[in-house]
């Protein structure tokens, strides 16, 4: 079970809603992924009406909505976006995203920390998208974030776990949930990072752009569950030399 801000969720796979060909496919994929938490863009939240098929589909699924502040270029804009989402949905959940660079969409660490501190004081459950920086993640934890969401690779790139060495340090040091966000392109990568000990992953592009998004969502759900089971079971130690699994006895030597 995944616990965030005193709320418990059965799934450790969070999904996004962007890039799907239509709302029906998105709804089927989210259902197949068995996700309890789903992110959505502020433009969906701001509309907040029955005409928005994506928002309608998500409400029918009964998932927890996690509005993001994507598009915000600084802390002030992000705080404003979060307050708008609260007015529209009455929810204090927010995925904090501040990436002024539109080419690589890398998060601004300084503005993210500033916005996180402000939003926590305002009573929001803040889940910040951030670089895989162990020092920054501890600072975000210190200001009261409900979790940290370090990237595996740039958003939408499907490049996989480019930041794996730093993710390991973040997991080792964190006292709050670690959710790897961005860059995961294959179920095997989701499984690998879950084996590492992260608490959850967020996947959007890899599912939405697959030839069969629903089947891919199922694959990711299985991978996340398998990876978590492996972590909890306790992975065997690695060795630089061979270690025989059977006794090396002298039974082939001639007897006297």
From Swiss-Prot:
The active site is at 95 (schiff-base intermediate with dxp). It holds the Pfam family ThiG. Keywords: Cytoplasm, Schiff base, Thiamine biosynthesis, Transferase. Pathway: Cofactor biosynthesis; thiamine diphosphate biosynthesis. It comes from the Bacteria. InterPro entries: Aldolase_TIM, Thiazole_synthase_ThiG, ThiG. GO terms for cellular component: cytoplasm. It is found in: Cytoplasm. Its EC number is 2.8.1.10. GO terms for biological process: thiamine diphosphate biosynthetic process. 1-deoxy-D-xylulose 5-phosphate binds at residues 156, 182-183, 204-205. It is an enzyme of class 2 (transferase). CDD domains: ThiG. It catalyses: [ThiS sulfur-carrier protein]-C-terminal-Gly-aminoethanethioate + 2-iminoacetate + 1-deoxy-D-xylulose 5-phosphate = [ThiS sulfur-carrier protein]-C-terminal Gly-Gly + 2-[(2R,5Z)-2-carboxy-4-methylthiazol-5(2H)-ylidene]ethyl phosphate + 2 H2O + H(+). The keyword Transcription does not apply. One of its GO terms (molecular function) is thiazole synthase activity. Belongs to the ThiG family. Homotetramer. Forms heterodimers with either ThiH or ThiS. Catalyzes the rearrangement of 1-deoxy-D-xylulose 5-phosphate (DXP) to produce the thiazole phosphate moiety of thiamine. Sulfur is provided by the thiocarboxylate moiety of the carrier protein ThiS. In vitro, sulfur can be provided by H(2)S. This is Thiazole synthase. It comes from Alteromonas mediterranea (strain DSM 17117 / CIP 110805 / LMG 28347 / Deep ecotype). The gene is thiG.
